[in-house]
Design a protein with these regions (language model features):
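Short, conserved catalytic-motif segment at the N-terminal edge
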Residues: 1-59, 141
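Residue-level signature of the cytosolic catalytic core of signaling kinases
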Residues: 4, 82, 103, 128-131
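Active-site helix/loop module of the DD-peptidase/beta-lactamase fold
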Residues: 53, 58-62, 74-118, 122, ...
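Cytochrome P450
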Residues: 149-158
Length: 209
């Protein structure tokens, strides 16, 4: 065991033993080589299932960077322009009472969290958030909270809906499919990197409370 591996393992074991973390994994690469691959604690407190090297974790907003990478791939190929309005690719986006304003919102502004659409539909439930069609229709009618580009505000949820729909309109594939085919597969991580996990890997997912 390398010194880095041993030190990392000791730190995360201490965190789980003291109850600061319930379960976690840590991996680190140096010059393309995996130098730390450590895990500790519980993946599921109800069943007692422990974290191991195959455990999958819901990474929430870490997927924003991966989604943005897909946009950059499309831009590099010339199929998407950061500075064109979103409505150029998704015409219905510029709808609703603020249609004229939304017609000016660019792909770049959406990527930079300056589009003015960080809010969610009133009373939206978790199931509603997962309904991409419902969110798409709502975003088409939604009014920006500020003049696009004037302010920055974290689009915690709507980033994925907006950028995901732009990608689908440009490429025809979902973000998840592009990630699987053009990022995860070439990098050899098809069994551990998903945007929309396959049902057959659900048993490996850590349970969040």
């Amino acid at each position: 065991m390398s010194n880095a591996q041993a030190r990392a393992q000791a730190v995360i074991d201490d965190l789980t033993e003291r109850g600061i973390e319930r379960g976690l994994q840590v991996a680190a690469y140096l010059n393309g080589e995996l130098v730390v691959d450590a895990w500790s604690g519980l993946a599921d407190a109800e069943t007692g299932r422990m974290v191991n090297g195959d455990t999958l974790f819901v990474t929430f907003s870490c997927t924003k960077g991966i989604t943005a990478t897909v946009v950059h791939l499309l831009a590099e190929r010339g199929t998407l322009d950061y500075d064109l309005p979103i409505a150029h690719y998704w015409p219905e986006f510029a709808s609703g009472p603020a249609a004229a304003v939304k017609a000016t919102i660019t792909v770049r502004q959406a990527l930079c969290h300056t589009a003015g659409l960080p809010h969610l539909p009133p009373g939206i439930t978790r199931d509603g958030l997962l309904d991409t069609d419902r969110m798409r229709v709502w975003l088409e009618q939604a009014e920006p909270l500020w003049a696009p580009g004037a302010l920055s505000g974290y689009h915690a949820v709507t980033f994925g809906n907006i950028i995901g729909e732009i990608i689908r309109r440009v490429d025809g594939r979902t973000v998840g499919r592009i990630v699987a085919e053009e990022i995860a597969r070439p990098l050899g991580v098809s069994d551990s990197l998903f945007i929309g996990a396959r049902r057959d890997v659900f048993r490996r997912v850590a349970r969040h409370e």
